[in-house]
Amino acid sequence: MWIANNWKDYEVIDCSCGEKLERWGNYTLVRPDPQVIWDTPKKEKGWKHMNAHYHRSKKGGGEWEFFDLPEQWSIHYGSLTFQLKPFSFKHTGLFPEQAVNWDWFSDKIRSAKRPVKVLNLFAYTGGATLAVAAAGASVTHVDASKGMVTWAKENAASSGLSDAPIRWIVDDCVKFVEREIRRGNHYDAIIMLSLIHISEPTRPDVISYA
C-alpha cells in the first residue's frame, strides 16, 4: 500500500462512527466516510471545535454546516498550491490521498530525461495536471465541467504554473479521445483519476505499472 505521507497542510486527526476529523491547512472539517465502521471515543478537541461539518442525509446527499470557515482558502503540497472550497457531496476540491500518485508520476517524468507528453482525463481541479507540469511534462487537461477546468486554472496560477505547457480542454473525455485517435495524436502517458495507462508499449521508460 502506498501512503500519502508528505503532506504538511493535510492530516486525518481522528475517525469514528462513520466520520473523519481532518485538518485542511488552518481549518478543521468533519466529513462522513463509509469506511469508518468503528465506534471509538471522540477524545480529540476538534470534534467539538470544527470549522465545518458535512451532515449526510438518510435520503441521499447532505449539507454543510459552517462554523467560522472562509468561503475559500488554500493549502500547499510541495511547490503546489490548491484553492479549496466546500461544495456538494462533502467535497472540498481536492483528494489528498492522490498525492502519492502525483509524486510517482513526477519521479517517472523527471527520470525520463526527455520531453514527456501527458493526457489527463477526468482531470477535476488539476492535482495530477499541476504535479506533472511542475515535473516538466506538457499536459492536456480534459474535464467535462467548465467550472472544474476554471478551478484547475486558478490552482495553476496559485502554483506559479500559469505559463506551463498545459492545454485546458472542456469536453466529454470519451469524445475527445475518439477525436485525438482520428487526428493521430499520441501521448506518452494517460492519467485517469488514480489509474495509469501506457499509450506507447515501446516506451516503458516513461511510466510503467507499479
Located regions from the model:
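Conserved SAM-binding motif I beta-strand of class I
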Residues: 138-143
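Mobile active-site "lid"/loop adjacent to the S-adenosyl-L-methionine
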Residues: 146-148, 170, 187-199
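Single conserved hydrophobic/aromatic residue that forms the stacking wall/gate
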Residues: 196-210
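S-adenosyl-L-methionine
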Residues: 150-188
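Conserved alpha-helix/loop element of class I SAM-dependent methyltransferases that forms part
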Residues: 96-112
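Non-catalytic substrate-recognition/targeting regions of SAM-dependent transferases
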Residues: 7-22, 29-96, 103
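Conserved class I S-adenosyl-L-methionine
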Residues: 115-121
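Conserved SAM-binding loop of SAM-dependent methyltransferases across substrates and taxa
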Residues: 125-137
